[in-house]
Amino acid sequence: MGREAETSPSLSLERRMRPELLRIGNEQSPVVVIDEFSGRLPEILAIAEGLAPFPALKNNYYPGLRRMIGAADEAANSYVEELCSAAAPFIGGAFDIADFSLIEASFSIVTTPPSQLSPPQRAPHFDSTDPKQYALLHYLSVPAASGTAFYRQRSTSIERVTEANVARFVTAAKSEAALLSPDSGYISGSDEFFEQIASVEAVPDRLLIYQGGLLHSGIIPATMSFSADPREGRLTTNLFVRGN
């Protein structure tokens, strides 16, 4: 799916969008935040609920359930198409790309309580070393004060993982993970290994766009509902796209 990033979408809901461009960390990496993004949250929640229950993930560090969205999922796929079209001018403006292609899309819900996390799930992570890969995160159901935080690895000063520094990051991260307490839970703010450099609050119908190489983690309070019900748990739409 190719998307022209310079063409404004012909959507009536575009008028309600409230975009903000953040620059975070020492690298001043762009992060896009768009409030009131879709204007049709109840309809999207109904689409996600219709695809439940979501399957458990295998060989994936995401702390919960994820339902991939494909062409056969007509309503969900149409929503993803519209999301990409509406986000295109913001991606183009913030990251200076002419167009992009969708890699994958899914509905995701956090269901793993802090006590059951694996060591990698307790630390910030990155999605890709590809500088042209971007993550789009659409907050849908927000059961408690949560969000997304961005980090700098203290020992290496890495904020964005690239092919040039991924080996250094992984070596340090493995050593540090071995030192984490088994009951440390989800990272919250800064700790001895990672410094939080920015955070974005999870607000229903807020869209977050950032480079896949940025170190990040969900802000997941221990008191949050870890329900697998899309209307009760922390539900997001997660997209990965690549600039062409």
Question: Which ranges hold each PLM region?
Answer:
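Fe(II)/2-oxoglutarate oxygenase catalytic core
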Residues: 1-209, 213-244
